[in-house]
């Protein structure tokens, strides 16, 4: 996979996904996908209700396309899933958004794709919960036809000092080759550098 020509799909355009999409889209062909039409309409007007991304950053994201249509994700090489994982009344994570995002990606991803998760999860979740959904809906085999990665989101909403580009970021992949691609990709937009974890589970525990 040639990193300079990679096509990205960012799933979820909240306070994590939008800044990520905006930074990547300065350099890469990027589709920002969200299921909320009103969110997409506001972003097309250059308005970010989370206030995490400035109008200048949105204007600079010259290769960013906003979409709520999964068909626009069919030619993507790398997906980055940034949907929320809220907790329920018993403080247990609600993985429903993660399951739905994995289903969306599984239905459109092509052989050779890499799916990176940033959503906050427990160690083991990516490979135990998300991978079977990706396999089910794609008909592809994990670590043969497609690969995964995990990079824990590190941004605190409203913190203008420790922003996406100047923090350091942990990365990981399901094979050494996938880990290399994921680490290289994030390294392009991060001034704070990256740290490659030994496995997805180690990155999830970080």
PLM feature segments, named:
Residues 1-206:
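Structural/interface elements that position substrates and couple domains in central-metabolism enzymes
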